[in-house]
């Protein structure tokens, strides 16, 4: 059998489809069709059943999450579905009652963590942006935060990640200041990123000093991770669930769409929606903008590492960081 790493992308997907079929034997489903859906760090397959139901099977990337973090995701989703009317991506229990399958098949290296989700209707909110939708998004995030705050102490087995520094993924290579990447990062760019990292890490230290207020947050709530269907919002992709603070979730949401001409209007609608149900987090825009800058640095480093032609992205994002320091430095 040809080694997995020597296969074409199509060949690797054929192998992974065999893994999916093996995982699906743990569910009480009569499978009609399994087809590749997308790869966005994780690999997704669509599953159609004979009775007409649709599902998505997610194969987690080892680079992005751990089993314990996946367990935290399932814990919160299960609680949200049990306790609230918030519409979220719904994981499906296996025949043994658990959510997560750790599977392996010949020809695919290692073990793969997999979860089956019910199909989420509608289209990405990114395709339907409006002040009304962003008002709803603000309310939805406020409801998520209310629920997280009301949860009892987390079980000892639940260990979400924490966004307590700029580079918070434990195994993430930091490359922007290394010799191998000097052609992308001249000294002034390195100094710029260093300055932002220092300022952001000061804020992270201040936030996480308040241990009593830490709670589960979504960690990646933006207009690509929300579907709009018949006027209602469905929140998906809780993979980045973390122990943190509402301010961090707000910053993630507001970090998207900043080049749009209607960004200020969308931002105001989001703030109004959130504030209609819950006190707005943070004391100033400076805190939100610092968290947005921290996320920008993380993405600059990530894109430099994985994109064969990252120069334009790096330059554009560095310009944003310069504007941040000018306005809030």
Residue locations for each model-derived region?
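A glycine-centered beta->alpha junction motif in the catalytic cores
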Residues: 62, 97, 110, 114-127, ...
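A cross-family kinase active-site recognition segment
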Residues: 127-188
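ATP/Mg2+ or Mg2+-diphosphate-binding catalytic cores
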Residues: 2-7, 298-329
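Active-site activation/catalytic loop segments of kinase-like enzymes and analogous catalytic loops
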Residues: 246-279, 293-309
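Juxta-kinase regulatory segment immediately upstream of eukaryotic protein kinase catalytic domains
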Residues: 1-31
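Protein kinase glycine-rich loop
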Residues: 35-38
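Active-site acidic catalytic loop and adjacent metal/ATP-binding pocket
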Residues: 40-49, 56-57, 91, 147, ...
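A conserved alpha-helical element in kinase catalytic cores
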Residues: 59-111, 128-136
């Amino acid at each position: 059998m040809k080694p997995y790493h020597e296969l074409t992308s199509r060949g690797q997907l054929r192998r992974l489809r065999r893994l999916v079929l093996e995982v699906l034997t743990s569910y009480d489903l009569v499978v009609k069709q399994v087809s590749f859906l997308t790869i966005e760090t994780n690999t997704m397959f669509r599953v159609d059943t004979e009775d007409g139901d649709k599902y998505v099977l997610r194969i987690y990337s080892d680079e992005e999450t751990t089993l314990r973090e996946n367990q935290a995701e399932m814990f919160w989703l299960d609680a949200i579905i049990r306790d609230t009317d918030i519409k979220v991506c719904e994981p499906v229990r296996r025949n043994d009652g658990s959510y997560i399958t750790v599977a392996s098949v010949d020809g695919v290296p290692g073990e793969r963590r997999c979860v089956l989700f019910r199909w989420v209707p509608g289209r990405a909110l990114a395709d339907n942006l409006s002040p009304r939708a962003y008002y709803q998004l603000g309310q939805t995030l406020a409801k998520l935060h209310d629920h997280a705050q009301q949860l009892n102490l987390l079980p000892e087995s639940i260990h979400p990640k924490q966004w307590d520094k700029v580079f918070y993924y434990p195994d993430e290579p930091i490359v922007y200041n290394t010799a191998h990447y000097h052609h992308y990062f001249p000294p002034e760019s390195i100094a710029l990123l260093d300055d932002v990292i220092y300022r952001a890490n000061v804020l992270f230290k201040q936030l996480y000093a308040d241990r009593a207020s830490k709670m589960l947050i979504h960690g990646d709530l933006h207009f690509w991770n929300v579907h709009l269907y018949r006027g209602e919002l469905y929140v998906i992709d809780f993979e980045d669930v973390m122990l943190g603070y509402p301010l961090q979730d707000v910053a993630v949401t507001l970090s998207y769409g900043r080049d749009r001409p209607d960004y200020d209007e969308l931002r105001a609608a989001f703030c109004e929606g959130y504030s209609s149900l819950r006190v707005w987090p943070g004391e100033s825009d400076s805190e939100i903008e610092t968290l947005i800058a921290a996320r920008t640095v993380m993405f600059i480093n990530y894109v430099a590492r994985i994109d064969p032609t990252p120069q334009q992205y790096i330059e554009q994002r560095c310009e944003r960081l310069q504007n941040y320091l000018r306005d809030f430095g």
